């Protein structure tokens, strides 16, 4: 059998994959009904976020377009395919924000350490953190 830590990791990853696919499926139904949506990658703002997902944070694409990372391609977090897809998908905490107009996007976000702060990309958040600790 599997060790407990491994089974928790698999359950967390597969639950996340199902949620990610469900969100994508819902957005595709909206598109099929004439609603033109976009999707924006949203990475968790903490030091555990993998480097390959930090650069995707804040990237917007059309609903049927893919994101690219480490030679892998996928329509949403936890849905990458390719030679390194396990490294891209396992324990990923990223999400997508679906929207019609840019002005619908959030203006604030919550981080574990800072509470509610102005909405920012991972890279800008990281720069602010470095400035604050200097």
What would you call each of these model-derived segments?
Residues 12-134:
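Activation/maturation switch segments at domain boundaries
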């Amino acid at each position: 059998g599997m060790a407990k830590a491994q089974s928790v990791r698999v359950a967390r990853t597969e639950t996340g994959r199902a949620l990610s696919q469900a969100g994508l499926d819902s957005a595709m139904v909206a598109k099929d009904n004439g609603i033109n949506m976009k999707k924006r990658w949203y990475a968790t703002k903490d030091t555990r976020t993998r480097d390959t997902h930090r650069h995707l944070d804040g990237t917007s694409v059309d609903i049927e377009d893919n994101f690219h990372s480490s030679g892998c391609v996928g329509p949403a977090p936890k849905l990458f395919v390719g030679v390194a897809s396990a490294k891209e998908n396992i324990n990923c905490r990223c999400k997508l924000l679906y929207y019609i107009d840019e002005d619908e996007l959030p203006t604030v976000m919550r981080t574990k350490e800072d509470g509610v702060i102005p909405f920012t990309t991972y890279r800008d958040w990281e720069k602010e953190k470095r400035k604050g600790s200097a």
